[in-house]
Amino acid sequence: MSCADECLEFLSTSATSEIEERHGAQESCHRQADAVKRRVTECRAVGLRSVQPRRLKAPCNIVVILASVCLLAASACGGPSRSKEAPGLVERSRVSMGTEVHISAWTTDEAAAVTAFDKAFNEFDRLDALMSTWKAGSDITRLNDAAGTVAVPVSVEVREVLHASQEVSEWTGGKFDVTFAALSGLWKFDHDIDGHVPDRAEIAPRLPLIDYRALTIDDRAGTASLARAGMKVNLGGIGKGYAIDRAVSILRDAGLSDFLVQSGGDLFAAGKRGDRPWRVGIQDPRGAPDTLFAALEITDAAFSTSGDYERFFIRDGHRYHHILDPDTGEPAARSRSVSILAKSTTVTDGLSTGVFILGGDEGMALIEKLPDVEGVIVTAENRVLVSSGLKGRLVQLKAPSE
């Protein structure tokens, strides 16, 4: 296989749940090409061909650039072109819900796929308008503003996500709790990151306001309410998964059967990429950027990863990250990374967060108890725990870095 062919094979057969928010879009094409060459070298070094389930961790917008680099390389080398009748990979990306949404489909009809993609992207935007805490007038903004007073009308979609969040809360003993948003403003890990570590005097008054059981959903009336003033809901830990599930339904209704939808650390893979399953990778939590420690082939399944290495800051040698334990109001300290495989991305999105907070042994016990759920946990001590259903399926490429 030529270098150009290997590059094309790598890009077209791989997917990772670790593509996060758009950044570095101005990186030069030369650096992109170097990254591809480096990736091919890594594959050869560990005895893997590029068809193995690994890929570069990069913003989704860069995936398109990398693909262009490789296509140009193939042309320069005189590689064969794909006929219009032959199936191939169609890919598009758009920013929604604060991150890059990437959709790929293996199909013979590019025009029909792109039309379906647009409908799926529009659904992300529609749900964002309902669930965002940043948009005035959204269902969640109105729910938060009315906390401790009256129930407010909310859409059926928001009620479905709230019901799903409460189910995951029950499974995890409250470790996953969308009312953790009562802590908002104390910790800053997004564009407003400032390295401030709130003290107990700041955190303690907020903790009684975190209680998923004080969230009431009335499907008959079409309303939701929060019992106490100061309570807040944030669906950032489950909303993207729900949006992916909705997008999957749209793509299937459009007649697509082989596709992948990805938003941040969450994805759903339907069917296959040609004659192979889709391949996903798990990032090494303490490794260099773009380094994976494990990989997995999946089909017709959801996959989500939560980790302490994306949104964080270091102060006085201690890592502070965005996954907060609702019992302490501080960053959870028992895990480095949790990946969950299940049938629904709504479930994998919320459960990966809840299991991350539970930690290794308790989290794995929950995974083993839940039907149709598998998982991989990298504990705070850097132990790798693999659920029974993934043993023999998960390819561990290296030990996670210390």
Give the residues covered by each predicted segment.
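Intrinsic disorder/low-complexity segments
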Residues: 1-65
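Mature catalytic core of soluble alpha/beta enzymes
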Residues: 3, 10, 29, 37, ...
